[in-house]
Amino acid sequence: MEVDINGESRSTLTTLPFPGAEANSPGKAEAEKPRCSSTPCSPMRRTVSGYQILHMDSNYLVGFTTGEELLKLAQKCTGGEESKAEAMPSLRSKQLDAGLARSSRLYKTRSRYYQPYEIPAVNGRRRRRMPSSGDKCTKSLPYEPYKALHGPLPLCLLKGKRAHSKSLDYLNLDKMIKEPADTEVLQYQLQHLTLRGDRVFARNNT
């Protein structure tokens, strides 16, 4: 059966049978007996407009496949790789489950350790700020969860509250604006800034 990948015949995509779903469903139904048939963690397969629910675990985390992925798997299955196609969905659902559970666990650790605290704002509204990884409460973490969610944090965030409070105070910016620009003063401040940065980096590495 030829189906357009661009999604023109979406109805045929949704009714496309998932390879291995029939083979896996009786075994899974015996393995995970739901408490009652109306529970969302029962191993019922449902099709939602181009998406098919592969697996839904007790934390209501759902693994989806798109219609294009189903189409590719169906083409693989007709190509004579039926055993591989039967092994693929369970493997993909396990990977999706592991990834989703890992992200939820990471969020739990973040919400446990990264308690937001208040910053007084200039315009009267109170902002909430997440403490950076340099604070004491995150020292007990065996791994660094911020690296999994985004790239390496900038130095001012890594150094904690001290870098926020002292980053611009020692430069005396208001005096620099009032006084005429003196090259010696600026050069001294620039040297002081680079030396201070080197010292911070050296202390970080050791």
Curated annotation (Swiss-Prot):
Keywords: Acetylation, Cell projection, Cilium, Cilium biogenesis/degradation, Cytoplasm, Inflammatory response, Phosphoprotein, Protein transport, Transport. One of its GO terms (cellular component) is cytoplasm. Its main location: cytoplasm. The modification Phosphoserine is found at residues 25, 140, 167. Phosphorylated. Pfam families: UNC119_bdg. It is found in: Cytoplasm; Cell projection, Cilium. It comes from the Eukaryota. High expression in normal macrophages, monocytes, and cultured rheumatoid arthritis synovial fibroblasts (RASFs), with lower expression in B- and T-cells, and little to no expression in other tissues and cell lines. Induction: Up-regulated by hypoxia in cultured rheumatoid arthritis synovial fibroblasts. Down-regulated by TNF in cultured rheumatoid arthritis synovial fibroblasts. Down-regulated by the inflammatory mediators LPS and TNF in primary monocyte-derived macrophages via a c-Jun N-terminal kinase mediated mechanism. Interacts with UNC119 and UNC119B; interaction preferentially takes place when UNC119 and UNC119B are unliganded with myristoylated proteins. Regulates the macrophage function, by enhancing the resolution of inflammation and wound repair functions mediated by M2 macrophages. The regulation of macrophage function is, due at least in part, to its ability to inhibit glycolysis. May also play a role in trafficking of proteins via its interaction with UNC119 and UNC119B cargo adapters: may help the release of UNC119 and UNC119B cargo or the recycling of UNC119 and UNC119B. May play a role in ciliary membrane localization via its interaction with UNC119B and protein transport into photoreceptor cells. Belongs to the UNC119-binding protein family. This is Macrophage immunometabolism regulator. It comes from Homo sapiens.
